[in-house]
């Protein structure tokens, strides 16, 4: 009975009477209120990080050798390991760009690094299951697939996104002038941010760290705003038929992550189906591809709120780079790509030495990138 309660993409009614209630009575108003609070805190955090980043410019330039795009990629990668999340690091990259600390290309590679670092989170959760005595291959496969798919997509994105940024094509497009939005948010945010800047007299690094802490809290609150999605017993058969279509899984991954703004959260929705054998590892690959595109929605929102056209262009280059790479793979060589990814995951998990080499490499690579 517990299994039949599962996750629905619509909130299941408690009973027939609940289903007949008006829509406004079925809406979770506390979650809407929490979403509004989360959005306010997100804008406040971004404002504090932006103000802090401007004052941090000399410190970052003196203490960190962010001289090229490789350095910023490694920095973003390790930064995401430290905070166990990619979105705050991507937001930090945009505030660094806005402060003139790094260039658009460096911002682009720092965001790429943040995605690589964020992929480690799912892998880390898998390690916790292994320590609890679960099967190593089963526990680590989702995290390894996420890391592998994300890494391969980002390789394509580096090439395509860099070409887009250097060509200036994205400069012809605009999401509109953010000045009106900025003026509205200034009225709501400035009194609170002024407390940190003028009353508490926090230094630049303090403002940035407070903003980073608030934005980490914000993404946690965003997760709590999500509707409780379940898959009812009657829907399992229908869903299990859909998972064998790569394009549908790609679109599903894009849609779910668009709502959740987190790859790890959207992947967790598949866990009940995976445990019951309805979703195999190969079915998850196109889902992860789609998730890797729409996970940048929160970063795009941050770029718009900064009212910085270069920041918007950078995020658009990243999203288009990942999307074009994913579509090429899906339409041209998906089955070969699928076999290659599964073989790599199997190789990593079959021996302790292979797993150790993989773990060593994902920490060594960002360090080497920083030192280049």
Tell where the protein language model's regions lie, with residue ranges:
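Intrinsically disordered, low-complexity non-transmembrane regions of multi-pass membrane transporters
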Residues: 1-33, 134-137, 169-199, 224-244, ...
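Helix-loop-helix hairpins and the membrane-proximal interhelical loops
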Residues: 17-73, 191-250
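Transmembrane helical cores of multi-pass ion-transport proteins
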Residues: 19-28, 52-79, 83, 88-100, ...
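Alpha-helical transmembrane segments of multi-pass membrane proteins, especially transporters
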Residues: 35, 39, 64, 68, ...
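C-terminal transmembrane helix pair
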Residues: 133-155, 296-372
